[in-house]
């Protein structure tokens, strides 16, 4: 088996396209069964970029969680938070830039990740509870010598980071945040999904109402944009 990356279209003929192809690891042959993922790099920091790292565990109220720790020469640490259904591999695209800058980093897991403790509800809470795990990771970084933190959130990780900024007493240790396609209003995201599927608006509203009762979803609490003026740290948004 192997891991390869495909890029831009080089040639398109009818229903066929020839794309850039780069083998990053192992060996792949014509006819091999493959699957696609969006991360663009294999495995872990060492496999992806040759970056030495330690697989550490930090303690949260829900239990112990795994994280990749990469050392650096600076005392500002970067904490990276992946999105829903993703993994720490989502951060590999940015990790080499962080390492080149000399910044230590911590790429974390949180409740309901594979191998991690589950949320008491059994479901993702889109930042309502996961921010506690981010806070625990921040406490770990500060205990290890971080003077301040830059926090990166991908997709649902952006919601986790935002609620951390609203809820955590450690917000004054945050030098800045980076959002990569953050999901900051779950209700609006569901509405857009319905529009993209040409569903009548009232059907989406009914579905949200039913799911709110069925899964105890507080749609208003998941609108992190409603009090965005409370965020006082610098934000870089992609």
Where is each model-derived feature located?
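The serine-hydrolase catalytic nucleophile loop
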Residues: 84-98, 110, 117
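Hydrolase active-site cap/lid region
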Residues: 163-221
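Short beta-strand/loop motif that positions the catalytic acidic residue
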Residues: 230-232, 236-238
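Gly/Ala-rich beta-loop-alpha elbow adjacent to hydrolase catalytic centers
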Residues: 153-157, 161
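Short beta-strand element of the alpha/beta-hydrolase
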Residues: 75-83
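N-terminal accessory interaction module
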Residues: 1-37
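Alpha/beta-hydrolase active-site loop
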Residues: 123-144, 150
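N-terminal cap/lid segment of alpha/beta-hydrolase-fold proteins
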Residues: 27-73
